[in-house]
Structures are given as C-alpha cells and as structure tokens.
C-alpha cells in the first residue's frame, strides 16, 4: 500500500495555502502558525480548510480544526483523516 509522507502532505498543504492567499512566496514548515503567515486571517483560514478538504477528499469536524496549533497538527490531522 502506498502511503503519503508528512513531507508530501506538507507540500500539498503549502500549494493550497499559496493558491488561497495568492502568494507563491509562502513557505510552511511543520512548526508554522497561521498568524506568522501574511494574509492568513480568520476568513482565509476558512477558505484554506475548505480547499484542503477538497484537495485531499476529506472532511474535517469543527472540533478538529479548532484544536490545531500549527501546520504540523494540520498535516497529522490530514494523515489521520485519509
């Protein structure tokens, strides 16, 4: 069975965030927090989460999203949701 690595998920998440923020310079690490990324405000957060759900073919629960502290938490949530 083929598994997606954390780095592959991070790369896809980065692509989604770049697209949603219309900023090809965005660079994410597992430790990145939303407030450290220009333009990643509450409205952008909703758009990013919806785009990630569509990109990965998954659906998040609100309680899952509200518990995210950084991009690494998001990557692990995506991995667990697949």
Task: Enumerate the predicted regions with their spans.
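Generic recognition of well-ordered alpha-helical segments
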Residues: 15, 73-76
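Two-component histidine kinase catalytic core, primarily the HATPase_c
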Residues: 44
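Phosphopantetheine carrier-protein modules
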Residues: 20-39, 55-69
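Thiotemplate assembly-line natural product biosynthesis machinery
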Residues: 2-26, 80-81
